[in-house]
Swiss-Prot record:
It is an enzyme of class 4 (lyase). The keyword Iron applies. [2Fe-2S] cluster binds at residues 122, 195. It catalyses: (2R)-2,3-dihydroxy-3-methylbutanoate = 3-methyl-2-oxobutanoate + H2O; (2R,3R)-2,3-dihydroxy-3-methylpentanoate = (S)-3-methyl-2-oxopentanoate + H2O. Belongs to the IlvD/Edd family. This is Dihydroxy-acid dehydratase.
Length: 612
């Protein structure tokens, strides 16, 4: 039977000094016989998805204490990708994921903590904490801050839903008046919470339900809704229960690595493909799997993408449905239910409640569940009021969306496509693979041939788009923006949003060794591996080359002869120490980013650090 990890600092005469310090934090003699449970919060006033988390950490702590544990809270950093977007701040976003994982490890191991509750929400925080949970493998419950309500604006007597991407797109649309820009800017992000579409944050928080480390509703109950309070209360109680199961009863069932198995990762990826989620989830699942010693690779993503149907189109792939509508249609378990009906899931995975997938579906499917208290959760609706207060409203939908033919969630026979919302492409331009969110690609662009226009930074590409240097049929290449080459693998939301504002998004492609925001749509292909800085072929593309993209056949090809390719490789290597670096880019790279670039791998490995 394992001893409390915390006994290292709370038991024995040699730990008198440590106990003295624990007492100075408010602990009593009785507390030294209880589990010490960390509340790993990510509250910050910089991020709307985290602005409301300060009091939520205290709420979880209250229920840990009342359930028999000792609660100790600490914070991680949290970067807002939307605010960091479009300038050098985006270089820090992806590296912050690994920094968060490290900081959690440092705090947990330095203080010999027994278990933890992770309060996350936005893009890199959930995956960073997941990496830490699988690395540490101590009892853990995840609970996120919840999604933002969608923005609303009335134009020509018609209410239109908005999100962050609308504000970005409108801001550079030459047809937008100053008044329109101001109105959309004020309306796009009305409440606390993670941005209202199926962007990276909400995708990851939904995937945590499928992996099994969070509670039902984690990814979809609005941050403002009173129903979300129950998740934090339950998390505080549950973590004490599963902690005691491990330390008192020697039950390892609920340890993160026993919950987040390869089958659970496959179910999570299937969910992401079916709901047309962010491509960043591929990066994060690969990284988390590595931390948990789970054999989940790009090959698994590729195989799943060929058989999992695309059952949802949510913002940014449509203007009609946001997370609040997805929740009304049954949320995560609504999609999993449809996949399960056609035997596309591993059914014996289980979650921190101790229930396997089929048991969860029987309780949480709005089509078959008969527990009125559970089904009531899915009636949780937006209030339409601007606020940064959690649990501040209790609005309900009059009915649920159970239309599986034309509704927010489709059944298999009504799917938008039968081969999924995310695809892995291979070819001479991406020997180790690349990712495209097919849910955001217009049908006419599934097969595309265009002429390359090459840029060696996101800034250079943005300048070209806004100054009318891009024409229909172009394939914009943005290289040396990968994990090593950036460094930091910037998101490319601005280039894709600007293409949209210039009405070129249906007539151009964008290819990069960087990545895309969950808010990206259009023919946007990222995660090119190997990246340019790792001697990837993308480094050899020249303006005027033709690029062939064939999504149905999962191919991406630079159309030059083998002899020409070999000549370009030779010419690049002849540059000596400057080979496979940008030829003219000026960028300040700090020591922190240089250290990251020394160890980071390409995207097909999850952009994790290679330190083994």
């Amino acid at each position: 039977m394992p001893k409390y990890r915390s006994s290292t600092t709370t038991q024995g005469p040699n730990m008198s000094g440590a106990r003295a310090l624990w007492r100075a934090t408010g602990m009593s003699s009785d507390d030294f016989n209880k589990p010490i449970i960390a509340v790993v919060n990510s509250f910050t006033e910089f991020v709307p998805g985290h602005i409301h988390l300060r009091e939520l950490g205290q709420l979880v702590s209250q229920y840990i204490i009342s359930s028999g544990g000792v609660s100790k809270e600490f914070n991680t950093i949290a970067i807002d990708d939307g605010i960091a977007m479009g300038h050098s701040g985006m270089l820090y976003s992806l590296p912050s994921r690994d920094l968060i994982a490290d900081s959690v490890e440092f705090m947990i191991n330095a203080h010999c903590v027994d278990a933890m509750v992770c309060i996350s929400n936005c893009d890199k925080i959930t995956p960073g904490m997941l990496m830490a949970a699988l690395r540490l493998n101590i009892p853990c419950v995840f609970v996120s801050g919840g999604p933002m309500e969608s923005g609303k604006i009335v134009i020509s007597d018609k209410e239109i839903k908005l999100n962050l991407v609308d504000a970005i797109t409108c801001g550079v649309n030459p047809d937008s008046s100053d008044d329109m820009i101001n109105e959309i800017e004020k309306s796009a992000c009305p409440t606390c919470g993670s941005c209202s579409g199926m962007f990276t944050a909400n995708s990851m928080n939904c995937l945590m339900e499928a992996i099994g480390l969070s509670l039902p509703g984690n990814g979809t109950i609005l941050a403002t809704h009173i129903d979300r309070k129950k998740l934090f209360v339950q998390a505080g109680k549950l973590i004490v229960k599963i902690t005691q199961e491990y330390y008192k009863n020697n039950n390892e069932k609920f340890l993160p690595r026993n919950v987040a198995t390869k089958e659970a990762f496959c179910n999570a990826m299937a969910l992401d493909i079916a709901m047309g989620g962010s491509t960043n989830t591929v990066l994060h699942l690969l990284a988390a799997a590595r931390e948990g010693c789970v054999d989940f690779t790009m090959l698994d993503v590729d195989l799943l993408s060929r058989k999992i149907p695309n059952l949802c189109k949510l913002s940014p792939n449509t203007t009609f449905y946001h997370i609040e509508d997805f929740h009304r249609a049954g949320g995560v378990f609504g999609v999993l239910d449809e996949l399960n009906k056609v035997n596309l899931l591993y059914k014996q995975t289980f979650n921190i409640l101790g229930l396997n997938l089929e048991e969860m579906l029987s309780k949480y499917s709005i089509l078959t569940g008969n527990d009125k208290n559970i089904i009531k959760m899915f009636y949780a609706a937006p209030s339409g009021q601007k606020t940064i207060k959690p649990f501040s409203q209790s609005c309900r939908w009059n009915s649920l969306d159970i239309d599986r033919k034309l509704g927010c969630i489709r059944d298999y026979n009504s799917a938008f496509s039968l081969d999924g919302g995310i695809a892995v492409l291979y070819g001479n331009l991406a020997k180790d693979g690349c990712i495209v969110k097919t849910a955001g690609v217009h049908e006419k662009n599934l097969i595309f041939r265009g002429k390359a226009v090459v840029y060696e930074s996101q800034d250079e590409a943005v300048h070209a788009i806004l100054n009318n240097k891009i024409v229909k049929g172009n394939v914009i290449i943005i290289r040396y923006e990968g994990p090593k080459g950036g460094p930091g693998m910037q998101e490319m939301l601005y280039p894709t949003s600007y293409l949209k504002s210039m009405k070129l998004d249906q007539d151009c492609a964008l290819i990069t060794d960087g990545r895309f925001s969950g808010g990206t749509s259009g023919l946007s292909i990222g995660h090119i591996s190997p990246e340019a800085a790792n001697q990837g072929i993308i480094a050899l593309v020249r303006t005027g080359d033709f690029i062939d993209i064939n999504i149905p056949n999962r191919k991406i090809h630079l159309d030059i002869t083998d002899n020409e390719l070999l000549l370009r490789i030779k010419n690049e290597k002849d540059r000596g120490i400057d080979a496979y670096t940008p030829s003219h880019r000026k960028r300040i790279v700090t020591s922190a980013l240089k250290l990251y670039s020394k160890f980071v791998t390409s995207a097909d490995k999850g952009a994790v650090r290679n330190i083994r």
